[in-house]
Amino acid sequence: SAASDVYKRQVLIDMSSIDPTESKAISAALAEKGIDMLDAPVSGGEPKAIDGTISVMVGGKRETFDKYYELLMNMAGSAVYVGPIGSGNVAKLANQIIVAVNIAAVSEALTLATKAGTDPELVYQAIRGGLAGSTVLDAKAPMMMDRNFKPGFRIELHMKDLNNALNAGHAVNAALPLTAELMEIMQSLKADGCEKEDHSSIVKYYEKISNVFVERERK
């Protein structure tokens, strides 16, 4: 049905986040009908999607990317060509690994600060200007300390991406031990009923095993 819908357009730009092997299979099926495909997953979360500054990671033929670059830039802050079909989703999986590990690191650090009797807000302010500063730190540390787990990106969706990353890693004999550990952490959160919360709720796992509660000090 996808092929019939795009037949006259001659190209399918798939912006979903899926296993790279699925992108390749879809592309092969479309190619039999003379239709090109780009796999073009995005990153940046809901806020950047709303304001049109998401990052797009694109796989497919270079000439097809060049042809539709301006179209992609109408909705994005950046659109980067990564390589042949499936490469966009490889980049997205790499992105999701980095985001998950960073959120876990922020959670672990703020748990340490709180358990040591130090105001996590002041620790956050102290480190955000140094090498540990990052987009993830600035986006997720305040959410953790404010106990705001309204989903920008849900745990269950991040689990889907990490599962795809593990499958992709196994397919090419790449060991992904941190990804596997994060999957187990998220599985624990799912068992606690947190799967529909924002992935910043990873901090709850650390709170549970350390018997501590991360939040801003009340003035």
Annotate each predicted stretch with a short phrase:
Residues 1-7:
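Short, small-residue-biased leader/transition segments that mark boundaries at the very start
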Residues 13:
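Catalytic-core elements of nucleic-acid end-processing and repair enzymes
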Residues 17-96, 100:
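Rossmann-fold dinucleotide-binding core
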Residues 51-59, 80, 84-116, 125-139, ...:
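Active-site-proximal catalytic alpha-helix in oxidoreductases
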Residues 85, 89, 133-135, 139-199:
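Interdomain hinge/lid region at the active-site interface
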Residues 119-128, 180-184:
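Beta-strand segments within the central parallel beta-sheet cores of soluble alpha/beta enzyme folds
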Residues 187, 191-219:
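NAD(P)-dependent dehydrogenase/reductase Rossmann-like domain
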